[in-house]
Amino acid sequence: MALSNTATPIYYGQFRDAVLRGDILVNQEISMEMNRIDGLIANPGVWYDDEAINGFISFCENELTLTDGEDLHLLDTFKLWAEQIFGWYYFVEQSVYEPEPDGHGGHYVTKYIKKRLINKQFLIIARGAAKSMYGSCIQNYFLNVDTSTTHQITTAPTMKQAEEIMSPIKTAITRSRGPLFKFLTEGSIQNTTGSKANRVKLASTKKGIENFLTGSLLEVRPMNIDKLQGLRCKVATVDEWLSGDIREDVIGAIEQGASKNPDYLIVAMSSEGTVRNGSGDTIKMELADILKGKYVNPHVSIWWYKLDSIDEVSQPDKWIKANPNLGKTVSYETYQLDVDRAEKAPANRNDILAKRFGIPMEGYTYYFTYEETLPHRKRDFWQMPCALGADLSQGDDFCAFTFLFPLSNGSFGVKTRNYISSLTLK
């Protein structure tokens, strides 16, 4: 298929048909993103090209491996997300100076430059959806297929966490499964004085992963603005940007430097977090405005998976809204165990709701269940065994004595005696 401004993308078309048939359940945010994609299809100024996405799929399935060395077979969701990046293009009219053939003088001509539409992709999806593997595929593709010299970075709240993007690439280099990687890894990295033909062309070094044919580099950077601003990177992946207590807008810092390149790409992947009022919440508010149409930005792709309501946690058939790869990269049994754990161990409830179902909750723990906070009638406890606890503080300030009376039904009666000194009272 050549460029078309009317064609429906292949993998999005298959996904949309499955949604309309009721085979795939989607939440409100994904539904709004589908409306945005339908708007791109109807826009005559935006063009779809299937060659790039099919080339990406062919490269991944012929050359790449999983972290453990098994052959990689792209999930349907990977194809859907990658199609948004590689499938859409638009043309920009530019006036370019062309010298005359004899070298004397010249003139300006108008040219149409083809540019990739999507510069940023946000992927908010539950834990266990292989999102880091997706980011690794994107980085690997640009590192080894893009013939220009690219500087690529990956960042995460910790440096070791960012290695999750690098690890599958290192495994693919070691395995050298396909013809391209066999060629790139042929030779020895120690051969620095002999023929360049006998040197390895792709290797993991102390800098990162280097492609010596093009001079391209993929490296890990710490997730703070000081280490990320001013970079002229062409491709950047940001992992778990909602999970940590991140108070800086690192995605904005990366974009300011990356925008020096005409076709930069930033892929930000994360599961929902439990830390509120950080930069991640501000970004999510912006994404919500884009999805609702309050703020038009066709250069951003948003795949925001979550349950529509906390009531759906008890409905296993709705869990696919939060993790479309459920049953492929993570089992239903794992989810069921976490649901049971959230019911039996309330301290873990917020984290499970956020990480497994995309429901933003504040805080990490709470001590009392709802039932334990309900008021009880006043009771007296006399001539019963008890346990005594005392908080003597500084002795001259505040003292508290608490008596716990074990009851026959497994609960405890509580009595407290609290005292302050006359000095504190004054």
Predicted feature locations:
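Phosphate/NTP-binding elements of NTP-utilizing enzymes
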Residues: 2-390
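Nucleic-acid-processing active sites and adjacent nucleic-acid-binding tracks
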Residues: 170, 212, 405-426
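Extended hydrophobic-aromatic, low-complexity segments
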Residues: 229-231, 246-247, 399-400, 412-415
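Gly/Thr-rich phosphate-binding beta-strand-loop-beta motif of the actin/hexokinase/Hsp70
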Residues: 382-407
